[in-house]
C-alpha cells in the first residue's frame, strides 16, 4: 500500500495566508514563507498554495513568493491561481514549484489540461474541483471563481462528470474541495469522496472538513483517498502534523514518517 500523504493548504490573498469558512469571510492567518517552513519542519509531505483571487481577477500567481518558498523548504509543493497558458506554468515550475494546479481556467478551457499534460507530463498536473452539494436537487455541482464571493458562479458540470472529463484530458491528480464542509471542521464528506473515489483512477486528495485526528483516519479508511488536505486545524495549531502522523500510524494507516 502506498503511504498516505498529509498536505497543509495555504490560501493566499494579497500576499498573506488567509482562511475562510465555506469559501467566505477570509481572515489573515500568517505570512506565506514562515508558515510553509513551519509545516515542512512538522513533517508535512507536501504543501499546496492557492492564490484564491487570481482567476477571478484575471491574473496569475505572484512568482516572487513561489521562489522564496522554494528556497526555504525541502518538500514538494504545488501552486494554483490563474494559470491559463503553458508559459505561465513553465515559469512557476522554473521558480521552484513541483506541481501546478488548475481549477477555474480548466473549466473555461478544458483543452488546457491536455496541453499542460503534453508539455510537462501527467505527474505534475493537478486539477482542483470546487464541489458544492445542492440539497434541492440532491446533486454535486462544480463551482467556478470561488476565491471571490462576488465572482463565484455555478457551472453546467456535475462533479462526477467533471471528474471523468479531467481524467480523460490528462490530469495526474485531483483535489476535491468540498465547499459545504470547508472550514467548519465537522469531518470530511465521506459519502461524496467515496463516490468520486470509484470514478477516479488517479490519486485523489480530500479537502474540506478536517477538525480532529480521527477525521483524517476516517477519510483514509472509509473513502480510501490518497492524501488529506487541511488548513485551519494546522493554521490554528489545533493539530500538530508530527503528532497526527504518530496517531495515524498507531491506527494502522501507512503514513510517510
Swiss-Prot record:
It is found in: Cytoplasm. One of its GO terms (molecular function) is lyase activity. Gene3D superfamilies: Aldolase class I. Pathway: Amino-acid biosynthesis; L-histidine biosynthesis; L-histidine from 5-phospho-alpha-D-ribose 1-diphosphate: step 5/9. One of its GO terms (cellular component) is cytoplasm. The active site is at 11, 130. IGPS catalyzes the conversion of PRFAR and glutamine to IGP, AICAR and glutamate. The HisF subunit catalyzes the cyclization activity that produces IGP and AICAR from PRFAR using the ammonia provided by the HisH subunit. This is Imidazole glycerol phosphate synthase subunit HisF.
Amino acid at each position: 500500500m502506498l503511504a498516505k500523504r498529509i498536505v497543509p493548504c495555504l490560501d493566499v490573498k494579497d500576499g498573506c495566508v488567509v482562511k475562510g469558512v465555506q469559501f467566505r469571510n477570509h481572515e489573515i492567518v500568517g505570512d506565506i514563507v514562515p508558515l510553509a517552513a513551519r509545516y515542512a519542519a512538522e513533517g508535512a509531505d507536501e504543501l499546496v498554495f492557492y492564490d484564491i483571487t487570481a482567476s477571478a481577477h484575471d491574473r496569475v500567481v505572484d512568482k516572487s513568493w513561489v521562489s522564496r518558498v522554494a528556497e526555504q523548504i525541502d518538500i514538494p509543493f504545488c501552486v494554483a491561481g490563474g494559470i491559463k497558458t503553458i508559459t505561465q506554468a513553465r515559469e512557476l515550475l522554473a521558480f521552484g514549484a513541483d506541481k501546478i494546479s488548475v481549477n477555474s481556467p480548466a473549466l473555461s478551457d478544458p483543452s488546457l489540461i491536455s496541453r499542460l499534460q503534453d508539455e510537462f507530463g501527467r505527474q505534475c498536473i493537478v486539477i482542483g474541483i470546487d464541489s458544492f452539494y445542492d440539497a434541492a436537487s440532491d446533486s454535486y455541482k462544480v463551482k467556478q471563481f470561488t476565491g471571490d464571493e462576488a465572482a463565484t458562479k455555478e457551472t453546467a458540470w456535475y462533479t462526477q462528470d467533471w471528474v471523468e472529463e479531467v481524467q480523460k484530458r490528462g490530469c495526474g491528480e485531483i483535489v476535491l474541495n468540498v465547499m459545504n464542509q470547508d472550514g467548519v471542521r465537522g469531518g470530511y464528506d465521506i459519502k461524496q469522496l467515496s463516490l468520486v473515489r470509484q470514478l477516479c483512477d488517479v490519486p485523489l486528495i480530500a479537502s474540506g472538513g478536517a477538525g480532529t485526528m480521527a477525521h483524517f483516519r476516517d477519510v483514509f479508511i472509509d473513502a480510501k483517498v490518497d492524501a488529506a488536505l487541511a488548513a485551519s486545524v494546522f493554521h490554528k495549531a489545533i493539530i500538530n502534523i508530527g503528532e497526527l502522523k504518530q496517531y495515524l500510524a498507531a491506527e494502522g494507516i501507512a503514513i510517510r514518517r
